[in-house]
Amino acid sequence: MLRLASGADLAFAAQAARFGDDAMTVQLIVTDEGATRVITLRRPEKKNAITQDMYRAMSAAIDTAQNNPAIRCLIITGGSGVFTAGNDLEDFLSDGTSNTGTARSANNAIKFLYSLAHNVKPIIAAVDGVAIGIGTTMLFHCDYVLASTTATFSTPFIHLGLVPEGASSLLMPHTMGYQRAFAMLVMGRTFSAEDAQVAGFVNVVVSPGHTEAEAKKVAREICKLPAEAVAISRRLIRLPPEDMTRRIDQESHLFGERMRSKEAVAAFKAFFSRKKA
C-alpha cells in the first residue's frame, strides 16, 4: 500500500499501488512537507529491497513533481538503519526474461532511472546504513547526499556476472575519477561513508538516525533560493539527461546479454543456494 500526503497530486494518487502479500504493509511512503516531497522506502524486513511496484511508485513520485510548482525539492530516504539492499532479486526475476535476456521487471527500474535522469528538481539522498547496487548508483543522479557514519556503499554487479547499470559507468568516473570508479564498479570494493565523502559523492557525514532530519534542513535551505536560478544553474552543472539515458540504454543492453551468460547463471544459482541454506 502506498501512503500519500493529503495534498499529493491526483495524477500521482491514481498510480498508487498495493505492495506485497500483506495489503496492510506500507513499502513506500510519499509525503509532501511544505515545498519538499519526501520518498521513504519502508521495507525494513527486507532491508528496503526494491520491488517492481516500488520502482513504479518512485517514478510516479518523481514524475508528478516535475510540473508542480509547489514542489521545490525531493528527498529519497530509507529511514533509520538502512537505505536499500538494491533490487529484490526474487521479485526482479519472477516475471521471467525478455527475448534480450533481461528480466522484464528491469523495465520498471529503467523507467525509474529515466525519471532520475530527466528530473529537474533538486534531489537529496539521506543514506543511513547499507546502499547496495542501485541503492548506490541512484546517488550519482542526486544533487546532494548525506550519509550516516555507519553507511556503506557497494555495487556487486561483477560478482553476479553482470555489468554496471543506472548510467553508473558514466557518472561514477565523472564524479570520482576512473580509478575509484574501477575499484567500486569492477573490483566490487565497498566504500565507507568517509571513503564516499573523500571520493566526492557524499556531501556530509552525520550521526546514525539523523540523515533524514539533516536532509530536510538542506531542502529548506534550497527551497529558499530563487527557483528559476536554481533550475538553470543545476542544468548547467549537470551532464545532459540525453547522455545519461543513452548510457542507461547501452548498459541495459549489455546487462541483458550478461543475464544469459554462464557466469551470471552460475552466480545467481550460488546466490539463491546460499540464501536457502
Predicted stretch roles:
Residues 2-79:
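Conserved CoA-thioester-binding segment of acyl-CoA-metabolizing enzymes
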Residues 44, 146-151, 202-250, 257, ...:
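C-terminal long alpha-helix characteristic of the crotonase
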